């Protein structure tokens, strides 16, 4: 998974902390965590295409949450940034080279055991991400750093 997922998740929480009426530019969100603005902007645009954020152009434009954090799962963000494809792709190497399963070998027609195991693991991972929403993440972040929302709002106001 790319670092863009982490950046996107933090950006969603930061947008919630900034307030519902404030649009925040990609450059300002990037500066808050010392990230490259152009790369973060790509992640934010992906979130906007997925309906997680809205974007508005212009000098007072930027990004806002399109829906409440409680309505956005971690899986929604991962899928928006990484795409919906499975992380593991079996290349069927068991069918190549001197060790290839022959057409009459027992189990050659069956699914690859490794692909099957990886698919089960990915399904569990996706279910776990889908079961947790961004509001739960926001709450945990505020328990860990209660001053963070106010620090962000003050920093944005000073810019």
Name each region found by the language model:
Residues 90-159:
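C-terminal regulatory/oligomerization modules of transcriptional regulators
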Residues 3, 69-95, 114, 118, ...:
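Conserved segment of winged-helix/HTH DNA-binding domains
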Residues 12, 44-45:
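Short, hydrophobic-biased segments on the C-terminal half of alpha helices
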Residues 3-5, 9-35:
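N-terminal helix-turn-helix DNA-binding core of bacterial DNA-binding proteins
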Residues 31, 48-49:
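Alpha-helical residues within the helix-turn-helix
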Residues 51-66:
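Beta-hairpin "wing" of winged helix-turn-helix
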Residues 38:
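Key DNA-contact positions within bacterial/archaeal DNA-binding proteins
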């Amino acid at each position: 998974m790319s670092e863009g997922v982490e950046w996107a998740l933090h950006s969603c929480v930061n947008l919630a902390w900034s307030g519902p009426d404030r649009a925040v530019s990609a450059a300002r969100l990037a500066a808050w965590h010392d990230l490259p603005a152009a790369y973060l902007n790509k992640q934010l645009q992906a979130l906007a295409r997925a309906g997680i954020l809205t974007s508005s152009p212009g000098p007072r434009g930027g990004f806002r949450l399109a829906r409440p954090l409680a309505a956005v799962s971690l899986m929604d963000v991962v899928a928006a940034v990484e795409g919906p494809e499975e992380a593991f792709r079996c290349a069927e190497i068991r069918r190549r080279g001197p060790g290839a399963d022959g057409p009459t070998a027992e189990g050659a027609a069956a699914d690859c055991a490794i692909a099957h195991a990886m698919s089960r693991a990915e399904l569990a991972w996706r279910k776990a991400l889908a079961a947790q929403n961004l509001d739960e993440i926001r709450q945990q972040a505020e328990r860990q750093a209660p001053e963070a929302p106010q620090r962000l709002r003050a920093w944005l106001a000073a810019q």
